[in-house]
Amino acid sequence: MFFSLTLGLVASSCDNAANTNEDSDFRYLADEFADIKVIRYRIPGWEQLDLSQKEYIYYLSEAAKYGRDIFWQQNFRHGLEVRKTLETIINNYDGDKNSAEFKEFLTYAKRVFFSNGIHHHYAEEKFIPECDKEYFAKLMRDTGLEESVENMIPIIYDKSLYKYRKNISGEGDLLLQSSVNFYENVSRKEAEEYYSSIEDPEDPTPVSYGLNSKLIKRDGEIYEEVYKIDGLYGDAISKVVEYLDKAAEVAENETQKHYISLLTDYYKTGNLETWDEFNVAWVKDTSSRIDFINGFVETYNDPLGMKATWEAVVNFKDIEASKRTKIISDNAQWFEDNSPVDERFKKEKVKGVSAKVITVAQLGGDCHPTSPLGINLPNADWIRKEHGSKSVTIANISEAYDKAAQESPKNMTTEFSWDSKETELLKKYNTVTNNLHTDLHECLGHGSGQLLEGTSPNALKEYSSPLEEARADIFALYYLADPKLVELGILPDMEAYKASYISYIRNGIFTQFVRIDEGKDVTQAHMQGRKMIAEWCYEHGKENNIIEKRSKDGKTYFVINDFEALRSLFGELLSELQRIKSEGDYDAGKNLIETYGMKIDPQLHKEVKKRYASLNLKPYGGFINPDI
């Protein structure tokens, strides 16, 4: 609510969002500032839901909103203090709001609201207001915050304080030098020793140790403070539970009521075995129209890849579009059997793979305002193996991204394509292959393969996230060029996959660097995975000129000369990534990411930033939720 208001926007009501399919004046692009664009999204199909389904979505959406403060506190222990300071100034300052300094302050506030904290949501580094600290202090004094000035100004302006959300410098202790609020006075060595002492490597169904807790060291004692109603974040969790209980009363069926009850029990107790029970029950529900995610789910923000941020997504099934993903899930065993990985690492029997295309009605926590385009859950490997997984592709969010891009007069396709043939190929096939890549990544990629007996799910530690995203990405890339997809009717012809290969290699090795400040490394998990794949293939294909670096009119281009050979490289790297995961080969995984996934050629970086700047585009996008 506040995020929308500070942008000077009024989010569409849900009915309006659904009806704007007929509204030629509807604009997806709502605001732009710094390196960010803010986008509105529609909810097609809302009018086809009955009243009880809409009521169910309403209560689930309210539950999604009440977890917001949890995520802010997880990102940074002073996060809420900063946000409330900014809110107070915006709501109470009665001075000149047209001055350059106030506009600089407002841009900073928007960036903080967008990132859910004072650190860049992708680059991890703390960003500083462009207005000077004396002006900021004056704003605080003018709005009744004089007593907080001494503490707040260093938090916001001191570049040496809280420098990184997640320590990406390679210097100092990984945990002690991170600002995320998952650990307190605990070093990496202490955290790893603590969890090693309580993990049972022989347990075939291990809980996700540390997932829903903060690890604290006080008076020489290390202990967990668990997220639950009578524990950490209890006030927010109690409101989430309140609205989940209301949702259960109007749920579509008894199955939903059952797993909502398990979820609220988990929130009350913090018991991770109950969390697993919920996930098993939830993943088996493949017939309900309405679905949701609500909980401490993804571990990307934890430097050790163990502790999860809170997130929520409320959605309903796009029945027509889901026909494509059903074909994929129905053939999951074929894809597993024909994967180019060692037979030891394959599942003998793929269980419970379900896939659908969804329409999002509400985003919350770590999924708002920046949203994923696809999701595959649960994350526990043993649940995936024994009970399956749910994979979703988010149609209306993907559409909003595409439509917002079309509202800009310039685009990256023309600027970075070698010739008109490439441009036309991308225009013809890119939307189809992008959606299919997401389907394959989420539905099959994450769920493919298995750990060898005795391999810890946490063996890859801080490299687990980029390696897992790369594994799912390259699984999808490998199969995009398989004639099976044409045979199944989900790929139009055998030219289409080339669009995906072109855009993926170009992005991974070059254009994604527009998101990163010059002189900095790649730090975000998905970006590291993409760079590692593209760079590895470029280097390993050099002898045969599979991917060629060309120059024209002083500009650099990366051109694929042999698509079939590139697919073979994808298969080779997929095999190695699966081996690394199945065996828990930390050193090999670390070597891949550090060698190919982090360092950027400074000349390429400078060039891509300059060319991108000429397009006047914003590299990051996020969304305003509709009011329901």
Q: What is each of the regions a protein language model found here?
A:
Residues 50, 253, 465-482:
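An active-site-proximal "capping" alpha-helix that borders the catalytic cofactor pocket
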Residues 9-13:
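C-terminal motif of bacterial Sec signal peptides marking the signal peptidase cleavage site
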Residues 558-628:
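Extended, compositionally biased alpha-helical segments that mediate assembly or anchoring
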Residues 443-455, 479, 483:
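Catalytic Zn2+-binding segment of zinc metalloproteases
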Residues 449-470:
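Post-HEXXH active-site segment of zinc metalloproteases
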Residues 431-444:
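Short alpha-helix carrying the canonical HExxH Zn2+-binding catalytic motif
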Residues 106-217, 224-422, 430:
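Contiguous, non-catalytic segments that form substrate-binding/exosite surfaces or channel walls
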Residues 71, 477-580:
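Long, well-structured alpha-helical subdomains associated
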